[in-house]
Amino acid sequence: GPAYGPVSPIAGDKEQPDGQIDMLKMFPAAFTMIGALLFSVPTWIVLTIGRNSVVTYFQSETYYMVLIIPVITIIVHMIHVRKGVPVKLAVVTGLILPNLILLWHGNVMYLNAVDKSDKLFSSDCNSFNGKRELQRAWEAAYGLYSNCINQTALNTGHSREKLMDTFRIQDCDEYKSVLTGLTEEGTRAYAESHVKDWTYLRHLEENHFCAGWCYHAQQLWSSKTHKDACSTVVSDIYGSYVRPHASQVCMLMLAALGATAMMLIMLGPVLRRHGLDW
């Protein structure tokens, strides 16, 4: 005799109403679109903060971990296309894992921004290692610049003041070898290289109109207008740019986490009622 009982609503089953079949066919694309809408903007914000040219110096590159989120979304999409029905583990993984990754990174960036904005604004040059190291690097650059100005003043007869108005550290003959620690032939000339520190300090002077590091001082690389110490400028970027954007990521992900939990609780009984294994 004919078997009675709930029929599993598998896509393509001729016994099922067209609406239900269409809903199942649409599910993989709809779920993937929800994931893209939820996670694409926070992912972009985290990457933008991490790659910011001012923040980069103090930031580890762990933020690139967020690039695994599109991979998770694609894998979950492929599972749903292959199975033809919502798969509980895939749904939970596709919604919760990217959320936690972004929440963690947003939180780390927020706490880092609060810490750095305070310590960089402080007049204490020793508030943390990175700040102290950059001050030493700036002092090394100033020493080179000062010697260079003195030597040029002796050779040309021009006053130090006039030379300091027009002459910049990169105009000094020995600048490149001290910067890289290498001679023109590529042999080691100095014990250390200043490439990372001096490139960063030069970028700040040329693009953020500052001079000196811990305190406002002689501009070494740029001739543009300047009014603040570069550490104050970086502190402001952490406070006015990094902190609010990182906070935004955290708020978005906490809201999404709550909405996801509610959806999963409500979705279970509905899917089971339609004969799906959930």
Where are these regions (language model features)?
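Membrane-proximal loop-to-helix boundary features in eukaryotic membrane proteins
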Residues: G1-S159, M164-R168, Y175-V178, T183-W278
